[in-house]
């Protein structure tokens, strides 16, 4: 397993990161080597066999919009009180497709600001501040390896309810999930809007499992 050692600007210790690039489509230009997988169904065992500090999950078809996006995610992921960290996913119209998950809705989980224009003025400008959320998308997620394994990794969802589920499992052990607006990704709409990137259109089996669990 190849690893990336990222030296956070205000830390003296290098952080070892494994990037898991998943899904179909071209890989974005990344500042790191990656493990390429077709889906996340067997990723739990892969992470168990690494000795990295943190794991970055990245969906093919995403393009970074912020230069220091890895450091931005890492500065929160390395905190002892934090579980999952994610950022905004924007479509080709500059509208939000994801900005952190909320739960307790008919679709299992819904994204904050979904469909809203990036340059709009949402309530309290919540798209522009670092804040706590219930969960973040597995399309762009960083989490410490020990936390990922301690909560059992990803549950077997076909949709991105896996991201909301992982966030809830982190909350259950007292950890926060963080949304930062400074690690944004542009989505290739030919690939990244298709399930299982987001929770829209989740299979009935996923919804049933999610409701029974939470």
Language model regions located:
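Active-site-adjacent helix/loop segment of glycosyltransferases
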Residues: 1, 165-214
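A short, conserved alpha-helix in the catalytic core of glycosyltransferases
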Residues: 70-73, 131-152, 157-184
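Active-site nucleotide-sugar/metal-binding loop of Leloir-type enzymes
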Residues: 43-54
């Amino acid at each position: 397993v190849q690893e990336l050692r990222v030296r956070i600007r205000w830390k003296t210790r290098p952080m070892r990161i494994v990037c898991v690039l998943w899904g179909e489509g071209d890989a974005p230009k990344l500042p790191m080597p990656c493990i390429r997988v077709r889906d996340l169904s067997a990723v739990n065992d892969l992470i168990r066999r690494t000795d990295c500090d943190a794991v970055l999950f990245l969906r093919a078809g995403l393009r970074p919009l912020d230069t220091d996006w890895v450091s931005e995610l890492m500065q929160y992921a390395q905190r002892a009180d934090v579980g999952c960290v994610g950022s905004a996913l924007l479509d080709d119209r500059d509208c939000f497709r994801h900005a952190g998950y909320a739960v307790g809705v008919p679709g299992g989980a819904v994204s904050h600001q979904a469909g809203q224009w990036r340059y709009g003025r949402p309530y309290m400008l919540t798209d522009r501040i670092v804040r706590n959320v219930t969960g973040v998308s597995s399309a762009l997620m960083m989490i410490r390896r020990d936390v990922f394994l301690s909560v059992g990794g990803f549950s077997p969802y076909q949709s991105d309810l896996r991201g909301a589920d992982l966030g809830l499992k982190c909350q259950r052990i007292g950890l926060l999930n963080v949304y930062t607006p400074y690690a944004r990704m542009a989505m290739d709409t030919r690939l990244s809007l298709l399930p299982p990137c987001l929770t829209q259109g989740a299979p009935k089996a996923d919804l049933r499992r999610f409701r029974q669990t939470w």
